[in-house]
């Protein structure tokens, strides 16, 4: 039984979140939560919340046993970028892209 949780428009770039996602792909959820707890990155907190949501979804909606769950799939897609202006010297301006990402975690008992 596969259960999905998503965080859309997460305020971190997909490139940064993928570094954390690669750490937990294929692991048991208990081990993945432990890794995320001690990973010193902002993205680790975002991924941890999505993983906890997926675990809760599996338990509540599908009646799955938490001890059997593992991270079947985790992928991070780029979301929309917010365009901002940063003033520069001599009346010029640069465009700043505040990137977002869509984090998807799939847990499975197989």
From Swiss-Prot:
Gene Ontology molecular-function annotations: rRNA binding; structural constituent of ribosome
SUPFAM superfamilies listed in its UniProt record: Ribosomal protein L22
Keyword Ribonucleoprotein included in the entry's annotation: yes
Function: This protein binds specifically to 23S rRNA; its binding is stimulated by other ribosomal proteins, e.g. L4, L17, and L20. It is important during the early stages of 50S assembly. It makes multiple contacts with different domains of the 23S rRNA in the assembled 50S subunit and ribosome.
PANTHER family: CHLOROPLAST 50S RIBOSOMAL PROTEIN L22-RELATED, LARGE RIBOSOMAL SUBUNIT PROTEIN UL22M
Family assignment from sequence similarity: Belongs to the universal ribosomal protein uL22 family.
PROSITE patterns: RIBOSOMAL_L22
Protein name: Large ribosomal subunit protein uL22
Coiled coil start-end: none
UniProtKB keywords: Ribonucleoprotein, Ribosomal protein, RNA-binding, rRNA-binding
GO BP of this protein: translation
The organism's place on the tree of life at top rank: Bacteria
Pfam families: Ribosomal_L22
Record bears the keyword Ribosomal protein: yes
GO CC list: cytosolic large ribosomal subunit
């Amino acid at each position: 039984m596969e259960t999905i949780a998503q965080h859309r428009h997460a305020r971190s770039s997909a490139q940064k979140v993928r570094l954390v996602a690669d750490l937990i792909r294929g692991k048991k959820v208990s081990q993945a939560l432990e890794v995320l707890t001690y990973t010193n990155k902002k993205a680790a907190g975002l991924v941890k919340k999505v993983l906890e949501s997926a675990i809760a979804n599996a338990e509540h909606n599908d009646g799955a046993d938490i001890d059997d769950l593992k991270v079947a799939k985790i992928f991070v897609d780029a979301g929309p970028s917010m365009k901002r202006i940063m003033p520069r010297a001599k009346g010029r301006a640069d465009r700043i892209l505040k990137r977002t990402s869509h984090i998807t975690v799939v847990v499975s008992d197989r």
